[in-house]
Amino acid sequence: MKRFALLIVMVSLLLAVPVAAQPPGEKPFLAGVATSNITPWLGGGLVGNFGTPPPAKHVHDELHARCFVLDDGTTRIALVVCDNIYISREVLDDAKRQLTEATGLPADRVLISGTHTHSSVSARWSNPLQPAKEFTEYQRFIAHRISDGVRCAINNLQPARVAWSTVDLPGQVFCRRWLMKPGTELLNPFGEPDQVKMNPGNSPNLLEPAGPVDPQIAFLALETLEGRPLGLLANYSLHYVGGTGPNHISADYFGVFADRVQELLGADRQDPPFVAAMSNGTSGNINNINYAVPYPKRQPYEQIRRVADECAQAVCREYKALAWQDQARLDMRQREL
């Protein structure tokens, strides 16, 4: 199956030029943000685990496409983070097609990702290798809503400043694949022999994690020229947290992080609204459980809130030291592999 590899490059100018001192005719850096509700209706199967997906019976928190549009006067790009674990490429291609037709923004200037929440309804085909001839009702819906969200972010474009940084948060990421003592049965989740054990629990046969983790949270921040927070896009290599209510639709810690950042920055009830998002990083072997110690019993959503708060607190502490830029050059490269 062909896949896209996208590289986004933001290179700041060597000297940031205050907007008031820009040479005549120089275009300001613009940013616009928006969200679009992509919550499915109840009854669809909640995906992310093995076995038959159970039907969704309750919406604990709404799912969104969180949209960021950046424009340096020459290049315009859109970044979208969707609260969904599975969205077929064909659905994303259709969202880009709609967006290009409505705005002229080229499809290769749009990056769309999913958060990997395990409490969403799938927007991919039942057999990803054999797409159906027609989209399901939810696939049509989510494609429209992604396109709508980016269009609204374009409508909200305004002169802005940009900054970026990183902060380490090692206490919430753990390798879920472990080397085990000789003689331990090693089967993967599909029942096939393996060299390590995935999600081994607090087994007495644990030796050590089979690989490293990436503790870094990277983030891009946007603010208005008056210094009002506009948007924040973060990335963390944590699979998901889980521990939701039974048969609940939820954005998991990704959604709580967005709300908590807005609260910590004092950016609620703005017009246009502040938008934060946490995108999913390189987390294939990383989850939120440290199997080296007993796992404490939590109430539904308790661990989600704990993780989201620690991430948001770490980012907002680093936010205070950001060096803001009035200008930044944008580029986006796409290669099909």
Region locations from a protein language model:
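Bacterial N-terminal signal peptides
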Residues: 5-16
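Conserved beta-alpha junction segments in alpha/beta enzyme cores
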Residues: 22-113, 117-274, 279-282, 286-292, ...
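N-terminal secretory signal peptides that target proteins for export/translocation
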Residues: 1-2
